């Protein structure tokens, strides 16, 4: 079985970065250690997942282009968005990692440092940006795979009608051109 890994892996960074964004916002509001560490763990896994999704997407892109019938502009936009998501996810990870390091090691005097609101704000902003970007990337990928809200994707069975009750013939004219 030659299963492309991209469709399998993509859901992990979407879930992890979106929940990580929520955890970062709660940390921003409360300053509680639990939420900082939760955001750090979620973004760590989400950034790795985003990188893996980007890498496997490269191979899938070649398969899709060989098959043809793909919207090249949308595919390119999805690819660019995925690359940007990886960058911002790792920037968010760095900011959260810095906050964790600072909280554990303390400030310049060696005393335990409290979470600075500025550090929390920057880390939360980057984490929420990564969550928004992964959502956009996922939306673009979903549009590539499943089509828009009103248009079926090329090669999909969307747009065909379900068999009616009784013996009436079923139309398989997907593009409504009469053939």
Features from the language model and the residues they span:
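Polytopic transmembrane helical bundles with strong interfacial aromatic enrichment
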Residues: 1-179
């Amino acid at each position: 079985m030659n299963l492309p890994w991209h469709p399998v892996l993509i859901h992990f960074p979407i879930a992890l970065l979106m929940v990580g964004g929520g955890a970062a916002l709660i940390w921003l509001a409360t300053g509680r250690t639990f939420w900082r560490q939760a955001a750090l763990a979620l973004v760590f896994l989400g950034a790795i997942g985003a990188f893996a999704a980007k890498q496997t997407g490269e191979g899938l892109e070649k398969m899709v282009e060989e098959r043809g019938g793909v919207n090249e502009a949308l595919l390119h936009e999805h690819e660019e968005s995925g690359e940007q998501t990886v960058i911002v996810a790792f920037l968010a990870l760095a900011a959260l990692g810095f906050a964790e390091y600072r909280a554990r090691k303390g400030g310049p005097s060696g005393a335990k440092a409290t979470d600075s609101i500025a550090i929390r704000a920057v880390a939360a902003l980057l984490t929420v940006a990564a969550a928004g970007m992964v959502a956009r990337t996922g939306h673009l990928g979903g549009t590539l795979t499943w089509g828009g809200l009103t248009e079926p994707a090329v090669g999909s069975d969307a747009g065909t009608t379900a068999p009616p009750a009784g013996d009436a013939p079923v139309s398989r004219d997907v593009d409504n051109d009469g053939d």
